[in-house]
Amino acid sequence: MKERTIQPVNNGLNGNITIPGDKSISHRAVMFGAIAEGKTTIKGFLPGADCLSTISCFKEMGVDIVQNGDEVTVVGKGLEGLQEPKAVLDVGNSGTTIRLMSGILANTPFFSCVQGDASIAKRPMKRVTNPLKQMGANIDGREEGTFTPLTIRGGDLKAIEYTSPVASAQVKSAILLAGLRAEGVTAVTEPHISRDHTERMLEAFGVKVTREGKTVKLAGGQKLTATDVQVPGDVSSAAFFLVAGAIIPNSKLVLQNVGMNPTRTGIIDVLEKMGATFTVEPINEGASEPAANITIETSSLKGIEIGGDIIPRLIDEIPVIALAATQAEGITVIKDAHELKVKETNRIDTVVAELTKLGARIEATDDGMIIYGKSALKGNTVNSYGDHRIGMMLAIAGCIAKGKTTIEDAEAVGVSYPTFFEELQKLAK
C-alpha cells in the first residue's frame, strides 16, 4: 500500500495541462474495434490500468491488439470471429470492462468465465445479467448471478424491450451490444438519459442506432466497420483540476482537449451555478465526441442544490464537487445520487468519512450528502480505500489544507490517471 504526502500549495496552481484520454471512450474503442471488420487505430487512448484490462481480455479472445503509449491498433475479428478464451477473463478493477464485455460475451456462442479484483467482487452484476438472461444468454455467478465470478455461455439471443430501473450507461451498453447479434430490435429505456458514448461510437462504426427521448434502439444483424478513433481528454479527470483551479488561491489553469459530450458535462453546469470563473473554447465542432479548452481561475463559490436529471451527467464527479462545496459559502445539498453506493467504494460513506477527517462539515444522507461551507481544512492521514476518484479528490483537498496530508492507498489513481501526481506537482511550482 503506497502513501503520498501532499503539502499545502501556497502560490496557487498555474499552467497548461493536457488531460489524458477519456476512460469510457478508450474502453469502447478497443471493444468495438475488436468486433469490427478491419483495422482500427485509436489515438489519445488512456493507458490506465482499467483500459489495459480491456485490452488483455480481448487479446485472450484472439484479437490482435498493439498498444504503444496512447496509440493502439486493433485488427478486428468481426462479430463472429472472437475465440473462446482458454483462461479466465480478468477485468482487474474495471466495472466498465466486465459489464460491457458481458453484453458481447452474451451474444457469442462459447463459454467464458469473468472475474475481477476484490472491489469488483462486491459490485452488483444482476442489473446487467438479468436483462441478458431475458435475451437468452446462460449466465451464472455467486448468489444467483449477483456477484462475480460470472460464467457466460452466449448465443441465440432474442431482442427485448427493456426498461432499466437505473440510469446506467453500462447497463444500457451491455444490452445494446448483446442486441447486435439478437433476433429483432433491441430497445432500452432509462429513467434519465445516461452517457451516450456507446451510441455515438456504434454510429461511427456504421451501426444504425435510433434515439427517441429516453429510449435507444438498434436492430440485430448489423456489422461494425473499422474506423479510426480520436479520444478526447476525460472530463472526469479534468474535474479534479477544474475544482483545484477554482478553490486554490492564486490559481489559473488551462485544461486542453477536454471531452465535452453533453451527457458528461454536469460538472461544468455545477461549477457555473456555484459561481466559478471559467471560459470554454470549443476545438473540434462537428466531431462525434466534442472537445474544448477550458480556462479556470480562483473563484468565490456559493452553495447550491444538486439533484434530478443532472446526476447521471456528473455521478463520477460528485466526490470532487463535495470538496468544492466545503469551500463554498452556504449549504450544498446533493440528492438522488443512490448510484454512489455501488461504485468502487460506497462513495457517500467514503467522501463523508475522509473529508470529515480533514475538518469539513459534511453529513451523509440516504441518497447523497449535505455540505456546510465554508470550512478551513486541516491536514491529516486519509485513505482512498482503493478508489481512484477518492484518492484524487483527497489530493486536491490536501493542497488547501493547513499542514501535510498523507493519502494511504494512493496508487489507486493509476486506474484512470497514471500521471496525476506528477501533473499536480508540476502545476504547483
Swiss-Prot record:
Task: Name the major location.
Answer: cytoplasm
Pathway given in the UniProt record: Metabolic intermediate biosynthesis; chorismate biosynthesis; chorismate from D-erythrose 4-phosphate and phosphoenolpyruvate: step 6/7
GO biological process: what's one of them?
amino acid biosynthetic process
Q: Where in the cell is it found?
A: Cytoplasm
Q: Which residues bind 3-phosphoshikimate?
A: K23, S24, R28, S168, Q170, D316, K343
Query: Example GO molecular function term?
Result: 3-phosphoshikimate 1-carboxyvinyltransferase activity
Q: What class of enzyme is it?
A: transferase
Q: Can you tell me which residues form the catalytic site?
A: D316
The cellular component terms of Gene Ontology attached to this UniProt record, alphabetical and capped at eight, are:
cytoplasm
Q: Which UniProt keywords apply?
A: Amino-acid biosynthesis, Aromatic amino acid biosynthesis, Cytoplasm, Transferase
| Taxonomy, superkingdom | Bacteria
**EC number(s) given by UniProt:** 2.5.1.19
Which reaction(s) does the protein catalyse, per the Swiss-Prot or TrEMBL entry?
3-phosphoshikimate + phosphoenolpyruvate = 5-O-(1-carboxyvinyl)-3-phosphoshikimate + phosphate
Binding, phosphoenolpyruvate: K23, G95, R123, Q170, R347, R389
InterPro entries given for it?
Answer: Enolpyruvate_Tfrase_dom (IPR001986), Enolpyruvate_Tfrase_sf (IPR036968), EPSP_synthase (IPR006264), EPSP_synthase_CS (IPR023193), RNA3'P_cycl/enolpyr_Trfase_a/b (IPR013792)
What family is reported?
Belongs to the EPSP synthase family.
**Role summary:** Catalyzes the transfer of the enolpyruvyl moiety of phosphoenolpyruvate (PEP) to the 5-hydroxyl of shikimate-3-phosphate (S3P) to produce enolpyruvyl shikimate-3-phosphate and inorganic phosphate.
Task: Share what the entry says about its subunit structure, partners included.
Answer: Monomer.
What is this protein called in UniProt? Answer: 3-phosphoshikimate 1-carboxyvinyltransferase
